[in-house]
């Protein structure tokens, strides 16, 4: 029998510590080896128990989870999954935690997300199992140099489509912040909660030369020098009307358990742009995006996957490589210049 993944739960609520411990212990691959009520207790337990994964509440007395994470990543980096409230403040704190090196997050249980308690259990345990295999700090060490580009307006490529999941909030930020302002329209599907997609787009906008916004209305004409982020609860699809490209939001069911789905976006890009697009698949667990990227390649588009070494989780890019969808494989820090060279 393979060794169980050792988990340390850090949360100030005794009720939630008990609930989360029970959920984690119900998975045969996982084992809760301890539960701490605050970061100070957690620090001692990490030294003594050597957990494989930490679940960390954001809101705690004495020291909040984000501050503790900052210290932890400096002194004793290990895979951390944040536990967040689905609020504006929770979104900002969670995105900051992901920036500092947390692998992933899941929401605190609420009436809304625990109506399907089995689904909630499997989400929590899947994220913890995946975190145990993550390359902590992969994003941090891969900051790309700012790319330069010329003649983007005359490029044959009229759109760039980017798909990402776990580890993607930072990978997308690293990629976009290294791109020049003169780019064709960029559409982004990042697996993220609906409450978080707006703040995610705002953070990107603040760190990029491009103008970045969340797509909020049904239909938008796509503009050069702009990037558009799918909201966390709708598919982003691209279509052409006359000579103009548009994005629209689609409320059909989840695909590959995801909404927004990268496959849906890539599939629509393949159909509407044929060979005049570039598809990029970044870090993330699962296989979403691989089949859509294959459609793009078959239609003549250029396709590129992030390499294993620079991924936090080499799941989606691996699936794209294995099914033959990815024409190029690049480390994150080489992607911005690679895209600019294609456009030039």
Curated annotation (Swiss-Prot):
Catalytic residue positions: 165, 191, 288
Disulfide bonds: none
A GO MF label: protein-glutamine glutaminase activity
Response regulatory domain sequence ranges: 6-123
Entry annotated with the keyword Disulfide bond: no
Catalysed transformations (reactions): [protein]-L-glutamate 5-O-methyl ester + H2O = L-glutamyl-[protein] + methanol + H(+); L-glutaminyl-[protein] + H2O = L-glutamyl-[protein] + NH4(+)
Post-translational modification comment from the UniProt entry: Phosphorylated by CheA. Phosphorylation of the N-terminal regulatory domain activates the methylesterase activity.
InterPro entries membership: CheB-like (IPR008248), CheB_C (IPR035909), CheY-like_superfamily (IPR011006), Sig_transdc_resp-reg_Me-estase (IPR000673), Sig_transdc_resp-reg_receiver (IPR001789)
Pfam families: CheB_methylest, Response_reg
Boundaries of every CheB-type methylesterase domain copy: 153-344
Entry remark concerning the domains of this protein: Contains a C-terminal catalytic domain, and an N-terminal region which modulates catalytic activity.
Protein's UniProt name: Protein-glutamate methylesterase/protein-glutamine glutaminase 2
Native source species: Vibrio vulnificus (strain CMCP6)
Taxonomy of the source species: Bacteria, Pseudomonadati, Pseudomonadota, Gammaproteobacteria, Vibrionales
